[in-house]
Amino acid sequence: MEKSQGYLELDKSWRHDFLYPLIFQEYIYALAHEQGLNRSILLENTDHDNKYSSLIVKRLITLIHQQNHFLIFDNDSNQNPFWKHNNNLYSQTISEGFVIIVEIPFSPRFVDSLEEKKKILKSNNLRSIHSIFPFLEDQILHLNFVANILIPYPIHLEIVVQSLRYRVKDASSLHLLRFFLFTLNKSISSFSKRNQRFFLFLYNSHVYEYESTFLFLRNKTSHLRSTSSGAFLERIFFYGKIKHLIEVFANDFQAILWLFKDPFMHYVRYQGKSILASKRTSLRMNKWKYYLVNFWQCQFYVWSQPGRVSINQLSNHSLDFLGYLSSVRRNPLAVRSQMLENSFLTDNAIKKFDIIVLLISLIGSLAKAKFCNVLGHPLSKPARADSSDSDIIERFVRICRNLSHYHSGSSKKKSLYRIKYILRLSCARTLARKHKTTVRSFLKRLGSELLEEFLTEDGQVISLIFPRTSSTSWRLYRGGIWYLDITCINDLANHE
């Protein structure tokens, strides 16, 4: 009940556009701590217990209340290692608290506390990353061209702040955001590594503004034939009303409407990559490319080279997206028809959306996290040798389970078997190193127990989904499964 009350208090502050006082509340940092611990895991998260201890939070709030609290960020304090540590700690803690404040109205837990709970929960499955692939399986077979887009980054930090103006209307909060970005500008690289959630929020806010305007044009222009360009530009998202952009819309408004009236256009994005697919011709796709480059430059002051948008024909191109390599291939099919005394043999080609796992990319992530070398040979993890045997095995099994869970949609499972082999042998080498013995003797002593730990979870999940009596279902499993509870991807090296 107390937690729900806290979320409702956040909602009240959000609706009244007065967020800054929430930074002084202890429960904000408790929420940041809890969300850090409950993050979707491939590896265990560390350092959260020290970062958000009650003593540190109380001291931080006391310093914030003081009139000269920002003196802790003074450059002279960096000469003292103690103050330098506090500088990093306080800036990181405040920044994560700030992100909690502006993120919380969109969190699933907060949505559960609202009155319209049942209506909103119907769309929970659409939050899953895997929901993209069934959509592609249904739609992409009927499309001809695809544009791979690398979304450009803003060239100046002030552009990021300006992108937040219509979402965060509290001037004090925006000034605090500017303080973080410009005070820590000299050490922005190290600060961004320690505060990944903070910068991820800023980047997503920037992309949100871009997509809101872009999708508004995409969805609404077919209904705006009788609307003048002047009224069209008064929409709230066009706060940047640049003279050049107005001239473009005023002179070429009908042409732009014609460009956007494409019912066969599909748009998908994750992180900094997006896909624009269409049934139209190559000429239409090149017009989209020209429009996107000018749209970024004129509306968001973002310089983008045309090379960041590459157009390819789906029949001879593979999509590298979300850890999968997707392609449309043709399966030849011969059909024999009997007509009275004559028979005919007809050759048909059936399109199939094929999805496989990028084994090289997965091995690269494992090598980056020191589970193996670049060639895929398993390595031990000396940092975990101090843990108990059961804890070490449980950690490796968790990583293996999450990787298998995410890449279960692959039509070829051999790549996953290779990854499981690397993790299993890396686990065995870590345990052998701990007990100061060889891997061979350790596996001989442990027997099949280690293998069962890595396979039990997958077997339980498969048996729940597909009864063993159904051979057809097991054949479908070998083809691929999509889960609707996966909301993020973590690079294996991020938590090391």
From Swiss-Prot:
Protein name from the UniProt record: Maturase K
InterPro entries: Domain_X (IPR024937), Maturase_MatK (IPR002866), Maturase_MatK_N (IPR024942)
Recorded GO CC terms: chloroplast
Record carries keyword RNA-binding: yes
Recorded GO MF terms: RNA binding
Keywords annotated in UniProt: Chloroplast, mRNA processing, Plastid, RNA-binding, tRNA processing
PANTHER family hit by this protein: MATURASE K
Known role: Usually encoded in the trnK tRNA gene intron. Probably assists in splicing its own and other chloroplast group II introns.
Entry's family note: Belongs to the intron maturase 2 family. MatK subfamily.
Organism: Paeonia peregrina (Common peony)
HAMAP family referenced in this protein's UniProt entry, alphabetically: MatK
Cytoplasm recorded as keyword: no
Pfam families: Intron_maturas2, MatK_N
Annotated compartments: Plastid, Chloroplast
Gene Ontology BP annotations: mRNA processing; RNA splicing; tRNA processing
